[in-house]
Amino acid sequence: MRVHEEASEDKEREVEEAPDLMPLSPPPTAAATAAVVAVAGQRLVVGYALTKKKVKSFLQPKLLSLARKKSIHFVSIDETRPLSEQGPFDIILHKLTDKEWQQVLEDYREEHPEVTVLDPPNAIQHLHNRQSMLQEVADLNLSNAYGEVCTPRQLVIMKDPLSIPSAVAKAGLTLPLVAKPLVVDGTSKSHELSLAYVETSLSMLDPPLVLQEFVNHGGILFKVYVVGETIRVVRRFSLPDVNIYDLENNDGIFRFPRVSCATNTAEDAEVDPSIAELPPKPLLEKLGRELRRRLGLRLFNFDMIREHGRKDRYYVIDINYFPGYGKMPGYEHIFIDFLLSLVQNKYKRRLSGS
């Protein structure tokens, strides 16, 4: 299994983002796969149905330039026209949450099994609800010599904010609690979170939502990106730890548009090596492989934290489909290699007659 690291572009990135590449299995070389495309005598056509914001962040000039060199052509899909009248496509990339579009894509998959859809709409739906999002991690019950992977204890609140304090007490959850919107629909609002320190502030929250026990983790979060058979780990600052003083002197709700907005105060902080140390590679390899299989997805990331004071206990706190790969160092080469590997696998199946 090939494992290598990329050097940071500058000293600041070296502190803020510590990338690490881990193929889950030995991938084909880009040159070998590009040769398959050449032998097939055709371009690889990738149709995409993405929001304008996603197009801007993902289809960056460097990615498009590299794609052209590898005979990969990205084509925008017109949602107002029948999908069957467009293309033909070899691969379809999508991240639209409209239910009508999801059904169109499901119908297209049945009619055109030769087209690779990234990813199946029915598999993506699993990540649109935070009640079910982490269930596969919990069911995995991953524990080995390298560590233990858990999920925070959580509670779903559908309505009636006034009932939240009693529901929390009945469930036995320990404050502080992180509140997240129940539904993940791709909007910025669905990534907002709130931190509640005391029971009396819970009724100020806005259901439907998920309440998760806050786990002190040294203010460091590990973003683990999955692209097919490869994963990349990026270390980032997160919400700071909560202490007794915080619990005794904060009685409101602290709201953050997203975790990254809560990290500004930690940008210049010195990072304790024991806190910043990346999770063990074998543990991430196992977790990435199992989640890929259980979720039925090839493009996702998950947020992972290490419990402060517990070197071998980790928590997965969120999973996202088709995340912001544009923020991942070196994503262009990783993604192009992934697309080419899909072609090679398809070509091998044709040769074998399967």
Curated annotation (Swiss-Prot):
Record field: catalytic activity: 1D-myo-inositol 3,4,5,6-tetrakisphosphate + ATP = 1D-myo-inositol 1,3,4,5,6-pentakisphosphate + ADP + H(+); 1D-myo-inositol 1,3,4-trisphosphate + ATP = 1D-myo-inositol 1,3,4,5-tetrakisphosphate + ADP + H(+); 1D-myo-inositol 1,3,4-trisphosphate + ATP = 1D-myo-inositol 1,3,4,6-tetrakisphosphate + ADP + H(+)
Ligand binding (ATP): 130, 180, 212-223, 238
Binding-site residues for Mg(2+) 1, renumbered to this chain: 303, 318
Pfam family of the protein (one): Ins134_P3_kin_N
Gene3D superfamilies registered for this protein in UniProt: ATP-grasp fold, B domain
UniProt region (Disordered), positions on chain: 1-24
Composition bias type Basic and acidic residues, residue spans: 1-16
Cystine pairs: none
Family: Belongs to the ITPK1 family.
Subunit structure: Monomer.
Protein name in the entry: Inositol-tetrakisphosphate 1-kinase 1
Organism of provenance: Oryza sativa subsp. indica (Rice)
